[in-house]
A protein has these predicted regions:
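Gly/Thr-rich phosphate-binding loop signature of adenosyl cofactor/nucleotide-binding cores
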Residues: 1-78
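Flexible, charged surface loops at secondary-structure boundaries
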Residues: 45-49, 78-83, 143-144, 222-223
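Structural motif
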Residues: 51-54, 84-87, 107-110, 148-150, ...
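Charged, amphipathic alpha-helical linker segments immediately N-terminal to NTP-binding catalytic cores
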Residues: 82-85, 91-126
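P-loop NTPase nucleotide-binding/switch module
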Residues: 126-146
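Glycine-rich phosphate-binding P-loop
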Residues: 145-174
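Conserved nucleotide-sensing/catalytic segment adjacent to the nucleotide-binding pocket
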Residues: 175-233
């Protein structure tokens, strides 16, 4: 994954001080920044030139205090590297020598009104999201009791119908049918493709607009994915988990998500079962396990009998 300096500047509402002058401007491929204070001091043995270069008050003060001939020499060497872009923080003016070298080498220069540390934190967050690994999954993603639940299963098993019932109960739709998933750190986030956002397909009814029918409170743009619930048609003879002590997982983008398999039979209230599954998962996450509690009670009971 990569992002162009122009897209980063647009996303962060940066001022353009100097445009890129190269036909093939280097793209940003790392969710990190470089503050080139050591390079302005003449140290280039270790230089993360491939990152966006952020110049703050300290770097600018040091550069201004250098003798003119030394400053020109350091900047010339600095711009000999394939730098993607330079961002000057704190509303500071761009030194003429730096601007001249940037234009000469075709490196875009942008300006930010924010303090350097605050800007850096926001930029790294934006870069992490922009450069996050992505994957598309078939399913329905909802926010149920504050937990991100992705319902999967083969076509016709009742994913959308179950999701619709959950929305009627006050839960929120994130995406139906197609879920765009991105990984930020060790967390997975899902959202709907913009073209089909807020829409749901119901067999026999067609396409419905969830926001128009249930209101703005029935949808949410993005949600963390905490749990996967897989719906499958009931298979006679298959050993389904009746105690909840068989922990299964599903791997997406290198992250293991807890997985619950729910068999579908006519007349079963799936929405209610999904709600209970969400509540039970939250209890487990907070340290309470119903199976362990039952086991403890049984052991206590038989110990007293002895």
């Amino acid at each position: 994954m990569s992002i162009s300096p122009e897209k980063l500047a647009s996303a962060m509402a940066l001022r353009t001080i100097s445009h890129a002058g190269k036909e093939k401007q280097p793209c940003i491929k790392m969710a990190d920044l470089c503050r080139p204070g050591l390079q302005f001091a003449g140290y280039f043995d270790i230089f993360a030139f491939e990152r966006p270069q952020v110049i703050g008050k300290t770097e600018m003060a040091y550069l201004d205090n250098l003798p003119e001939d030394v400053r020109c020499e350091r900047l010339e060497r600095y711009f000999s590297y394939d730098i993607p872009c330079i961002i000057i923080a704190r509303k500071m003016k761009c030194p003429p020598e730096l601007l001249r070298q940037a234009r000469k080498n075709g490196v875009p220069v942008y300006g930010s009104d924010e303090e350097t540390s605050l800007f850096s934190a926001k930029a790294i967050t934006d870069l992490c999201e922009a450069l996050a690994p992505r994957q598309t999954c078939h399913g329905v993603l909802l926010d149920v009791f504050g937990e991100g639940l992705m319902i999967t299963g083969e076509s016709g098993v009742g994913k959308s119908e179950c999701a619709l019932e959950l929305i009627k109960h006050g839960h929120q739709l994130v995406a139906d049918d197609v879920v765009d998933i991105s990984r930020v750190g060790r967390a997975l986030f899902g959202e709907s493709p913009e073209m089909v956002r807020d829409f749901m397909e119901l067999r026999g009814v067609g396409i419905v607009d969830i926001k128009a029918i249930f209101g703005i409170g029935s949808i949410v743009r993005r949600s963390r994915i905490d749990l996967v619930i897989h719906l499958e048609f009931w298979q006679e003879g298959k050993d389904y988990d009746r105690l909840g002590n068989k922990e299964k997982t599903m791997e997406i983008l290198g992250v293991e998500l807890p997985l619950i398999e729910l068999p579908v039979r006519p007349g079963r209230s799936l929405a209610m079962v999904v709600e209970i599954a969400a509540r039970n998962w939250r209890l487990k996450a907070e340290g309470y396990d119903a199976v362990a509690e039952l086991d403890r009670r049984l052991k206590k009971h038989y110990t007293h009998q002895e």
